[in-house]
Amino acid sequence: MKRTPTAEEREREAKKLRLLEELEDTWLPYLTPKDDEFYQQWQLKYPKLILREAGSVPEDLHKEVQEAFLTLHKHGCFFRDLVRIQGKDLLTPVSRILIGNPGCTYKYLNTRLFTVPWPVKGASTKYDEAGIAAACQTFLKLNDYLQIETIQALEELACKEKSNIDAVPVCIGPDFPRVGMGSFDGQDELDIKNRAAYNVTLLNFMDPQKMPYLKEEPYFGMGKMAVSWHHDENLVERSAVAVYSYSCEGPEEESEDDPQLEGRDPDTWHVGFKISWDIETPGLAIPLHQGDCYFMLDDLNATHQHCVLAGLPPRFSSTHRVAECSTGTLDYILQRCQLALQNVRDEADNGDVSLKSFEPVVLKQGEEIHNEVEFEWLRQYWFQGNRYRKCTDWWCQPMTQLEGLWKKMEGVTNAVLHEVRREGVPVEQRNEILTAILALLTTRQNLRREWHARCQSRIARTLPVDQKPECRPYWEKDDPSMPLPFDLTDIVSELRGEFGTLPWSA
């Protein structure tokens, strides 16, 4: 079943088409460090983009981080994601792994990634290999370092804005003197720290030589893209993003820009920036050498788009983010499940439940949570196969727990349907219940069909065994352990037919 694009997706696609139409056969201008006006343009139009050159990062940290990347790669911990874009399943050219606070998730392109926990104080995590444990510890150390650097950069930016000056450098080399930025009141200081409170890092890997096809950058003619133009999703508003880049060539092999070459050097990895939907301001293509870091501060991620332009060597990156986790942690979804199940009075040995209330608002909330845990958590997790077991078993017990709570919610739905069908229920009460639940049951049926089809798709069948999508929860029609069938078509049709006078379209 093809998903209908959201209004936001349709608007974004329309903007893209309009921009391409305006361009016709011409390229927009962009600048590289070879251009005289490059740094001036960066300062004027991209002041919230900061580059820390590799020489300004401690050498021992470089060594640890680069070893950690290679260790995770050796253990097969990077995975290409089967993502959903405008109703189509696509395999990302970049392989990824999410590391971060225990129980956190990060959602992008309709895909929820689950953290391999880094070893924060008070948490106990069992890793499959000692090398994986050491790597997670290293990325926590890098996170702490980048957090300090980000706070410094945000303070510099705030001072610049307060003083109304343009003196803050956008590119900082190893000899740049780090000076105190003066005083901030408590609220300003807290705000800056919160905007740098990275709770996850999304690690990326790509070897361009093993990718038979990469898209060409469509607006500026910048060459092959590893990652298309985008805003990073699912972040706390105005929070920073910090990126550590590691391309695998040795320092002696790094290519210097050829002054005779027009545009960016295609052998070198770059990050591209442009102001969203602006065809007047030149874009930037910033070369990324081994160990360089860049920072997107304040609202830059909202007002600008960025892309990653492929070079020749394999490249890793660690992208540190303040993920918007208000609805994306294990604690959150467990609390939601408990809220839904507060309406259960008793549960019999055979799984039948009795409910405390048939108030429509209570039933609607329960069915909403039922859908949330099934489609935002269980199916998202199992769609990624057994990939997380390569690193840790941290999510195994929580997923078993969530599945048990979800199964109780199946019993709740069954109890609601029994009430709807019970003789003697006043027509008005029956209609109120149906108005509360039928749209949610219809959504559940449609999404189950969609997820089942995604798991069976041709592209899903090409994945390695440990990454093959699993349609879970799934059960056959005559499974005695389940109160309701997997396929709700007949139930939805029955309810619609029996109560067809209700305004279901609403």
UniProtKB/Swiss-Prot annotation:
Its cofactor is Fe(2+). SMART domains: FTO_NTD. Disulfide bonds: none annotated. Substrate binds at residues 96, 108, 230-233. Residues 212-223 are annotated as: Loop L1. Binds 1 Fe(2+) ion per subunit. Its EC number is 1.14.11.-, 1.14.11.53. Fe cation binds at residues 230, 232, 306. The modification Phosphothreonine is found at residue 4. One of its GO terms (cellular component) is nuclear speck. GO terms for biological process: DNA alkylation repair; regulation of multicellular organism growth; RNA repair. It is an enzyme of class 1 (oxidoreductase). Residues 32-326 are annotated as: Fe2OG dioxygenase domain. GO terms for molecular function: broad specificity oxidative DNA demethylase activity; ferrous iron binding; mRNA N6-methyladenosine dioxygenase activity; transferase activity. It is found in: Nucleus; Nucleus speckle; Cytoplasm. InterPro entries: AlkB-like_sf (IPR037151), FTO (IPR032868), FTO_C (IPR024366), FTO_C_sf (IPR038413), FTO_cat_dom (IPR024367). The modification N6-acetyllysine is found at residue 215. It comes from the Eukaryota. It catalyses: a 5'-end (N(7)-methyl 5'-triphosphoguanosine)-(N(6),2'-O-dimethyladenosine) in mRNA + 2-oxoglutarate + O2 = a 5'-end (N(7)-methyl 5'-triphosphoguanosine)-(2'-O-methyladenosine) in mRNA + formaldehyde + succinate + CO2; an N(6)-methyladenosine in mRNA + 2-oxoglutarate + O2 = an adenosine in mRNA + formaldehyde + succinate + CO2; N(6)-methyladenosine in U6 snRNA + 2-oxoglutarate + O2 = adenosine in U6 snRNA + formaldehyde + succinate + CO2; a 5'-end (N(7)-methyl 5'-triphosphoguanosine)-(N(6),2'-O-dimethyladenosine) in U6 snRNA + 2-oxoglutarate + O2 = a 5'-end (N(7)-methyl 5'-triphosphoguanosine)-(2'-O-methyladenosine) in U6 snRNA + formaldehyde + succinate + CO2. The 3D-structure of the Fe2OG dioxygenase domain is similar to that of the Fe2OG dioxygenase domain found in the bacterial DNA repair dioxygenase alkB and its mammalian orthologs, but sequence similarity is very low. As a consequence, the domain is not detected by protein signature databases. RNA demethylase that mediates oxidative demethylation of different RNA species, such as mRNAs, tRNAs and snRNAs, and acts as a regulator of fat mass, adipogenesis and energy homeostasis. Specifically demethylates N(6)-methyladenosine (m6A) RNA, the most prevalent internal modification of messenger RNA (mRNA) in higher eukaryotes. M6A demethylation by FTO affects mRNA expression and stability. Also able to demethylate m6A in U6 small nuclear RNA (snRNA). This is Alpha-ketoglutarate-dependent dioxygenase FTO. The lineage of its organism: Eukaryota, Metazoa, Chordata, Craniata, Vertebrata.
